[in-house]
Curated annotation (Swiss-Prot):
Localization (cell): Secreted, Extracellular space
Protein family according to the UniProt entry: Belongs to the peptidase S1 family.
Protein name in the entry: Chymotrypsin-like serine proteinase
Upper taxonomic lineage: Eukaryota, Metazoa, Spiralia, Lophotrochozoa, Mollusca
Regulation: Activated by an autocatalytic mechanism.
GO cellular component, one term: extracellular region
């Protein structure tokens, strides 16, 4: 089967049943304060702000997201943290404009598998981590014992072409070896898995539109950044993430 590999923020061609896209299907509601590092990357349109991707706080003033989420000037973005519900004000929300951002120098949106799909965002205002609603994730150089199940957190759609859920979603997924992941994607043009990727899979559960850039964690250890998956959000293919431990040294220089 041949398919066009795409990372999508908003829309897909209706006729392409096997295109590639990032976001969460088959998840459940997260509790308040359960994932305090989860953020929303938003873009301004007129006087309003709209969620386009996830992000993850790793210091009080820096966050990570997927490089493919960023194409405009830094001033067109803001980050929101402490947001459990997208359409409600819970009183725990904190927002900051973006001073600057840096995509990985070897990111290539035209290459198969979208290698090096990671970016650093610098916040204008540091986040207040005195409450349980907002706080940075722990990021270690290796994945420790995170070899089986991990939590994926998302603010994207719960089904392709459905509306975004109001509540932050989570899903428990199984980690695959990269060899197994590559085999499951065989036959899909452009679906290349490399050492800078980590894959998770659970039948009927998947990333979906709007989840790009969001975190994959084991406990409070950041392991992956949502990069790409199947656009139908069917849960029939693995979801592919940027393996953050592969980029530890680069991020520390930013």
């Amino acid at each position: 089967m041949n398919a066009l590999l795409n990372i999508l923020l908003c829309t897909l061609a209706a006729t392409a049943l096997a295109e590639i896209s990032p976001n969460i299907v088959g998840g459940s509601n997260a509790a308040a304060g359960e994932f305090p590092w989860q953020g929303s990357l938003q873009v301004r349109s007129g006087t309003s702000w709209f969620h386009i991707c996830g992000c993850v706080l790793y210091t009080t003033s820096k966050a990570l997201t997927a490089a493919h989420c960023l194409s405009n000037s830094a001033s067109s973005y803001r980050l929101g943290f402490g947001m459990l519900r997208m359409n409600n004000v819970d009183g725990t929300e904190q927002y900051s404009s973006v001073t600057s951002y840096t995509n990985h120098p070897n990111y290539n949106g035209n290459a198969a598998g979208y290698p090096n799909d990671i970016a650093v965002l610098r916040l204008t205002s540091s986040m207040d981590t005195s409450s349980s609603a907002v706080g940075p994730s722990v990021w270690l150089l290796v994945e420790r014992l995170c070899r089986t199940n991990m939590y994926d957190q998302r603010m994207g759609k719960t089904q392709w072409r459905w509306q975004h859920p109001n509540n932050l979603q989570k899903v428990d997924m199984t980690v695959l070896t990269n060899s197994d992941c590559s085999s499951r994607w065989s036959g899909i043009s452009g679906a290349t898995v490399n050492s800078g990727h980590i894959c998770i899979f659970e039948s009927g559960r998947s990333a979906c539109s709007g989840d790009s850039g969001g975190p994959l964690v084991c406990g409070n250890t950041l392991t992956g950044i949502t990069s790409w998956g199947i656009s139908s959000c069917s849960g029939s293919y693995p979801s592919v993430y940027t393996r953050v431990s592969s980029f530890y040294n680069w991020v520390q220089t930013q």
